[in-house]
Amino acid sequence: MSDVSEDLICVGALAGSFGVRGEVRLKSFCANAEEIEDYSPLLGADGQTRYTLAITRAIKGGFAARIVDVETKEQADALKGVQLYAPRDRLPSLPDDEFYHADLIGLEVYDTGGTLLGRVKAVQNYGADDLLELHGPGLSATVLLPFTKAAVPTVDLSQGRIIADPPAGVF
């Protein structure tokens, strides 16, 4: 697990500079990508560093944005890889069948027979559905489990577990 507070949700990341005038490349992880600006100022992983941003335009793979006090390409480049967080209480409530990735990470995953399959290490998305990245004892390599209603019929946050019915060949 990381040192990031459970009260913070990762909503985006900085991918370096855009141009030579201090703009940054911004990747949004919000369902409606441009809504990331609504949560500004955003916080760094330490929960203290503030990033007040304004989107200037859409670009391939995200947005160009200005951040207060970032005025040069070098300053923007220095922020490459910074993850941006918003306090959970500023984000919208989710329907019962939707989850913030941060809430899934660390949950134990069991099959429908009660056998422990592993623990959620990360949530990935390569363009289609989300994938739960599982690791744990008995797994020789990381396993990617499709995060669909068919493969993951139950997510029980109060019990800290997921019940999975993995497609044939996943395990």
UniProtKB/Swiss-Prot annotation:
Pfam families: PRC_RimM (PF24986), RimM (PF01782). Transmembrane segments: none annotated. It is found in: Cytoplasm. Residues 96-170 form the PRC barrel domain. One of its GO terms (cellular component) is ribosome. Keywords: Chaperone, Cytoplasm, Ribosome biogenesis, rRNA processing. The keyword Flavoprotein does not apply. One of its GO terms (biological process) is ribosomal small subunit biogenesis. Signal peptide: none annotated. SUPFAM superfamilies: PRC-barrel domain (SSF50346), Translation proteins (SSF50447). It comes from the Bacteria. The PRC barrel domain binds ribosomal protein uS19. Binds ribosomal protein uS19. NCBIfam families: 16S_RimM. An accessory protein needed during the final step in the assembly of 30S ribosomal subunit, possibly for assembly of the head region. Essential for efficient processing of 16S rRNA. May be needed both before and after RbfA during the maturation of 16S rRNA. It has affinity for free ribosomal 30S subunits but not for 70S ribosomes. Belongs to the RimM family. PANTHER family: RIBOSOME MATURATION FACTOR RIMM. This is Ribosome maturation factor RimM. It comes from Ruegeria sp. (strain TM1040).
